[in-house]
Amino acid sequence: MPQVDPELFDRGQFQAELALKASPIAAFKKAIRQAREVLDGRFRSGRDIRRLIEDRAWFVDNILQKAWEQFSWSEDADIALVAVGGYGRGELHPYSDIDLLILLDSADHEIFRDSIERFLTLLWDIGLEVGQSVRSVDECAEEARADLTVITNLMESRTIAGPERLRQRMLEVTSTAHMWPSKDFFLAKRAEQKARHHKYNDTEYNLEPNVKGSPGGLRDIQTILWVARRQYGTLNLRALAGEGFLVESENALLASSQEFLWKVRYALHMLAGRSEDRLLFDHQRSIATLLGFEGEDAKTSIESFMQQYYRVVMSIAQLSDLIIQHFEEVILAPEDEAPPQPINSRFQLHDGYIEARNDNVFRRTPFAMLEIFVLMAQQPEIKGVRADTIRLLRENRHLIDDDFRNDIRNTSLFIELFKCKIGIHRNLRRMNRYGILGRYLPEFGFIVGQMQHDLFHIYTVDAHTLNLIKHLRKLQYTQVSEKFPLASKLMAKLPKPELIYLAGLYHDIGKGRHGDHSEIGAVDAEAFCQRHQLPLWDSRLIVWLVQNHLVMSTTAQRKDLSDPQVIHDFAGIVEDETRLDYLYVLTVSDINATNPTLWNSWRASLLRQLYTETKRALRRGLENPVDREEQIRRTQSAALDILVRGGNDPDDVEQLWSQLGDDYFLRHTAGDVAWHSDAILQQPADGGPLVLIKETTQREFEGGTQIFIYAPDQHDFFAVTVAAMDQLNLNIHDARVITSSSQFTLDTYIVLDTEGESIGDNPVRVKKIREGLTEALRNPDDYPTIIQRRVPRQLKHFAFAPQVTISNDAQRPVTVLELSAPDRPGLLARIGGIFLEFDLSLQNAKIATLGERVEDVFFITDADNQPLSDPELCRRLQDAIVQQLSVTQEPGVELTRLTI
């Protein structure tokens, strides 16, 4: 800390200003304001961050000393003002907690009560937000013995004013000789760290990470230093290196990583104007600019900044693992430790952990850097890697070069890992953690820490990739197979499961490079297969899966699966059942590893339907596509059988069906046709709108709630319906609109609740939905008001111009309107209003929400049920949608251009 810094705080000038004023408050406030301006200016000019946070602590020391002097403490008074916690370390960010201990010799506080209260009031009046406690030395001991946080804070202390002897006595009575021996302290701190990591999802890669508390954050460094202080009396990184827990390169990396996070935290506090440790979207762009990250636009500068952030916290996490493991081996070492058990000539088992048998293992036999992970996968009883061996891996990973990558011993070992029955994900994660995976596969190293700046992808590309492999592995667990029955069944029967793991490893590896990441990844995957000498069939399957890993989800969510041509086209891409099985399992795991909230019961049922229909098409043969007329006949025959058995007159059924048209029977199953027809035939002529509600499947984790509406057609039918559903808090995922020749509309909607689940067996909720829709459709002139909900904070930071593409379908007389837009409350209701304004009829719709954006497809016609043909009308329609759906973006974020 500086001894003198008159620009930051001039003691003489401050004392003079105090003497001129009746009240000291104005002088203190002025000094605090000026100091903040000086320090912020120094930060913006690039001043050393360590010096900055120490300077701020020095300034606060001076202010507190001057405030303390305002009261009558005798020189030999048994009371001291002590800084504890982060402030006790001499580190203060702009709005960090200023933790104070007013330390007394005696538990009798009365003699000082009035002065203490007036002192704390003064601090409040001058704008210092402090956390304070008033304790005697004995009370400190009592509190510290019972509370891990208290003992931790007291370990980091400095006397600001008053006699130093009180603090020394406090340190003595709270030393390891009296409480919290280093073993107990270590176990408690390790448990505390695990709980904290779990709070932040056990990942460094949260979209809005906490720079202090998230894994790899500042608190992990502090945990290391706290344990070291309790064990060795050491409280800085350099001293820790001196104890042999860090080599010089690790010390330098940890110090530079800490300084980077200090810069981020300082900028966060400065921009937020308050204590803020969450790296919110609100601040990411400003901090990226403040710290000098540049890109083609705001989005790429944010992604560059966040990639640097993630790589820094990954480094901290790696070193934290190493040092905590080192502490465990030293502090928890049993007195009667068993001798190490040899595994082979290179490795041995030491207290349950694998370790190199000598320091030259990796230098003399570099292939052992892959072998160690294969051994752990083959012997799952191994708890992990000894600290010294982790360090040896880090020190020797530079030996992984092109010669290493092409060595058949290494390529064979890497493939062997993927053939292991268990431990694939765990050991790939270790390889990534220790920096081995990115060295062995440079293309993987490129995606480490790479964040895509959206709400759809909630993990970095490398974390998502490893999560996908984890999900593939979990499909073998009973509790997971219940939620993903088909995927689990198929995973168990894949002829070579290692191939889907390898395809998963490469499916997104092309991201971050210009071009189609599927095509780029396929090229990388092919090179990998050649280098690892995989058989031709295996290689072709892996490359095909990488190249086509998105096609199944895209088809299921954006195409009409009731259309035989859609199934035929998809089957033509897949070509055989083996590819279909692999692709289905990969798709399910990809969606769940991208963002768990994306997986819902309706997506599950769509993928199952596409899988089942495609399997039938492949078994039938692509040269024998489904005949539309034959499909209609089969549907009608099966439905008629159900209806007749239910007591319906076949003639009445035939008369109703003659009005419905072919599309109706192509889009609905025989069971649904029978359900609809039976209800329509029972409906009185003047009974008003008919609203039917049921679940689409009996499978627990699949399907949605189907709402069928039969009513006289009216111009505003779709607009009224979706507005009413919006008011009922229903999310529409599929819409099928049929108009009969008798001018009745038969609309089917698949809906989920706001949690992404079907309505289920909830009679009260079903009754409310039915009554709400019936009332809205009975009185369409009372057009339901679109609910004005606030656009969520996060969505505002991913605003982009809605993209609208309008084209005519070559196979059907409809116009296809494809919409990609920022999600917002009431979006479909707004679209319905626009269709009403432009006199358009909706024939079908596919609805998909992907994070912060929706990707919807609407099949529409004009008032004469014809495709749109007027270019000017299309242009005005596009403009209206863009204007209605644009979410106000953050300043400086450019909107994406409209594409026609």
Curated annotation (Swiss-Prot):
Record bears the keyword Hydrolase: yes
InterPro entries in alphabetical order: ACT-like_dom_sf, ACT_dom, HD/PDEase_dom, HD_domain, NT_sf, PII_UdlTrfase/GS_AdlTrfase, Polymerase_NTP_transf_dom, UTase/UR
Annotated region described as Uridylyl-removing, given as residue ranges: 343-705
Essential cofactor(s): Mg(2+)
SMART domains given in the database record: HDc (SM00471)
Regulation of protein activity: Uridylyltransferase (UTase) activity is inhibited by glutamine, while glutamine activates uridylyl-removing (UR) activity.
Superkingdom of origin: Bacteria
Keywords: Hydrolase, Magnesium, Multifunctional enzyme, Nucleotidyltransferase, Repeat, Transferase
GO terms under biological process: regulation of nitrogen utilization
Role played: Modifies, by uridylylation and deuridylylation, the PII regulatory proteins (GlnB and homologs), in response to the nitrogen status of the cell that GlnD senses through the glutamine level. Under low glutamine levels, catalyzes the conversion of the PII proteins and UTP to PII-UMP and PPi, while under higher glutamine levels, GlnD hydrolyzes PII-UMP to PII and UMP (deuridylylation). Thus, controls uridylylation state and activity of the PII proteins, and plays an important role in the regulation of nitrogen assimilation and metabolism.
Family label: Belongs to the GlnD family.
Free-text note regarding domains: Has four distinct domains: an N-terminal nucleotidyltransferase (NT) domain responsible for UTase activity, a central HD domain that encodes UR activity, and two C-terminal ACT domains that seem to have a role in glutamine sensing.
Protein name as catalogued: Bifunctional uridylyltransferase/uridylyl-removing enzyme
Organism: Pseudomonas fluorescens (strain SBW25)
